[in-house]
């Protein structure tokens, strides 16, 4: 590296520091003073279910006044309470309304009624990375690297705000109209300064320290990044089995096998991310994220250009118009029922 290149690297590191410092001020201001509810169910025309979960669903809706399309997440308060997800749900809304980053889905409105909580987010018509990955089989390394770079930058941003994401998987990554990623579902995200102990996440993506009920930190996100990059480039995750317990045994064993088509740089990066020993895992060492950003597999990545969305995406999803749902599966439609009496008012008073 010549002196000018070193100087450029130095100034880039400085400008990232400045950027993150300002981002933290912005975040803390919104985190401490979340704005009041700014809409109601009657403001939206419901179009179609985009996905369902254990305590709610996500629907495509159209804002009647502006005719804009949005994705509305509807959570049944009583089910949230039954499944002991109150804290997670309050976290999700409080975090989403306070963050701002090119690869994070934006929360536009939130409100509640007697029965449900509502989070209205920008609609990302390209659908889940999951469905594209399954259809194509696997992504080429440059294709996988394009997405991985966006996750690296997103985690660098979130971690600088003391946020752990904890739910990285292809189902939670939407592909937007420009072919870039939008991270969605902050249901497990949490603001943590030191360690935390909650068992949550998706079996294939859990870090060993979560499985072993150890206190864990943001390094679990870097482990999950390793799982994601492997799955994007292979077409299947590094640890899989029929039963979660068998998956956990494989994860904790620290043994990973790579497909023969993986480049040696990719294998090297993955060995450092899928590292059971926390004192050796990339992202968790004294250089932090720069061990990942300067790794050989990312040598061709222009981090600033990715952040500015100036790099041409390897794939643009096909869709017709802003309200097209052809990239999402079909689900059985169900009426939204709202009780005449308030449910769980106390539990969700801060929502």
UniProtKB/Swiss-Prot annotation:
Modified how: Asn-3 is deaminated to Asp in more than 25% of the proteins, giving rise to 2 major isoelectric variants, called CB and CA respectively (0.4 pH unit change). Deamidation proceeds via the so-called beta-aspartyl shift mechanism and yields either 'D-Asp-2' (major) or 'D-isoAsp-2' (minor), in addition to L-isomers. Deamidation occurs after the addition of myristate. The Asn-3 form reaches a significantly larger nuclear/cytoplasmic ratio than the 'Asp-2' form.
Domain Protein kinase: 44-298
Residue positions where Deamidated asparagine is found in the record: 3
Residues at the catalytic site: 167 (proton acceptor)
Modified residues (Phosphoserine): 11, 140, 322, 339
Highest taxon, organism lineage: Eukaryota
Phosphotyrosine: modified positions: 69, 331
InterPro entries in alphabetical order: AGC-kinase_C (IPR000961), Kinase-like_dom_sf (IPR011009), Prot_kinase_dom (IPR000719), Protein_kinase_ATP_BS (IPR017441), Ser/Thr_kinase_AS (IPR008271), STKc_PKA (IPR044109)
Residue numbers bearing the Phosphothreonine modification: 198
Entry's localization field: Cytoplasm; Cell membrane; Membrane; Nucleus
Regions that span the bilayer: none
Catalytic activity: L-seryl-[protein] + ATP = O-phospho-L-seryl-[protein] + ADP + H(+); L-threonyl-[protein] + ATP = O-phospho-L-threonyl-[protein] + ADP + H(+)
Keywords: ATP-binding, cAMP, Cell membrane, Cytoplasm, Kinase, Lipoprotein, Membrane, Myristate, Nucleotide-binding, Nucleus, Phosphoprotein, Serine/threonine-protein kinase, Transferase
Any GO BP: negative regulation of TORC1 signaling
PANTHER family to which the protein is assigned, alphabetical: CAMP-DEPENDENT PROTEIN KINASE CATALYTIC SUBUNIT BETA, CYCLIC NUCLEOTIDE-DEPENDENT PROTEIN KINASE
Protein family (similarity comment): Belongs to the protein kinase superfamily. AGC Ser/Thr protein kinase family. cAMP subfamily.
Subunit relationships: A number of inactive tetrameric holoenzymes are produced by the combination of homo- or heterodimers of the different regulatory subunits associated with two catalytic subunits. cAMP causes the dissociation of the inactive holoenzyme into a dimer of regulatory subunits bound to four cAMP and two free monomeric catalytic subunits. Interacts with PRKAR1A and PRKAR2B. The cAMP-dependent protein kinase catalytic subunit binds PJA2. Interacts with GPKOW.
The protein, known as: cAMP-dependent protein kinase catalytic subunit beta
Organism: Rattus norvegicus
Name of the gene: Prkacb
